[in-house]
Amino acid sequence: MKNTFSRLFGFGDKESEFELQDESHEEIDKKVYEEIQEIPIVNITPNRYQPRTVFDDARIEELALTIRTHGLIQPIVVRQYEDDKYEIIAGERRFRAATKLGWEKVPAIIKNLNDTETASVALIENLQREELTAIEEAVAYQKLIELHNLTQEALAQRLGKGQSTIANKLRLLKLPEEIKNALLEKSITERHARALIPLKNEELQLKVLQEIVEKQLNVKQTEERIAKLLEEAKPKRKAKQKAVSRDTRIAMNTIRQSLQMVADSGLNVNSEEEEFDEYYQITIQIPKKK
């Protein structure tokens, strides 16, 4: 029977595959080629596909103290890529804690996985936890899409998430590096970052980012600040302007809401509004491919 990983991403049955569940419930199958071995720490390298870029030193220290008291209850999982050289598949936090304790060797289970399987296991294992930042989560989604040639919709179905969730995370990757770094460092929240997306202008985005950090703006204050900037950026209306009917306002708002729904679904739609004496003009560009 195929395990969770096989069902999600279509790999064949292998005795060396393992269930991707929450770490507290993860069960490593005790099958052939999976006996626990003591591997020198100097021969182990972190997973190159690890989506987590920031490790909380305090949390690692706490884990190290727990391991010192109770031992390493669950071995790390690795794969061999050269003679006596191993790459972590799962358990980098445990590996870091063991290193902090000064261990020379660490208990490990060796798995026979290729690059694609190794990357996918590392990404999914981390996605199942709540400790990833929004940017790390977005990077993980993007890598899975690229590894398995998936659409956002297909990835959402396989991970049991809404497509809008995937789309909203991926939109964060289009922000400037300074904003993504602020998210990684938790200087701002995901909602702060998402509020910056409509600005489009990178200079304005960075200006507001600085205000958020320096003035400690909450999300509501940030949204109000951005709304003001967007209003100021609109073309100045002519002094003499005919009154706009209620039906016209409703029609315009309906179109704007529809465009936002399409954008939230992951489709990169561009639109431009122009106002003339007798009518409004909305130009919409919809890509043929996502």
Curated annotation (Swiss-Prot):
State where it is primarily located.
cytoplasm
According to the UniProt record, one GO cellular component term is: nucleoid
Highest taxon listed in the record's lineage: Bacteria
**GO BP, one annotated term:** chromosome segregation
Q: Name one Pfam family in it.
A: ParBc
Instruction: List keywords of the entry alphabetically.
Output: Cell cycle, Cell division, Cytoplasm, DNA-binding, Septation
Q: Quote the InterPro entries the UniProt record gives.
A: Chromosome_partition/occlusion (IPR050336), HTH_ParB/Spo0J (IPR041468), Nucleoid_occlusion_protein (IPR023705), ParB/RepB/Spo0J (IPR004437), ParB/Sulfiredoxin_dom (IPR003115), ParB/Sulfiredoxin_sf (IPR036086)
CDD domains named in the record: SPO0J_N (cd16393)
What are this entry's molecular-function GO terms? DNA binding
HAMAP family given in the database record: ParB_Noc (MF_02015)
Task: Family membership, please give it.
Answer: Belongs to the ParB family.
Under PANTHER family, the record lists:
CHROMOSOME-PARTITIONING PROTEIN PARB-RELATED (PTHR33375), NUCLEOID OCCLUSION PROTEIN (PTHR33375:SF8)
Chain's role: Effects nucleoid occlusion by binding relatively nonspecifically to DNA and preventing the assembly of the division machinery in the vicinity of the nucleoid, especially under conditions that disturb the cell cycle. It helps to coordinate cell division and chromosome segregation by preventing the formation of the Z ring through the nucleoid, which would cause chromosome breakage.
Q: What name is this protein filed under?
A: Nucleoid occlusion protein
Organism, per UniProt?
Bacillus cereus (strain ATCC 10987 / NRS 248)
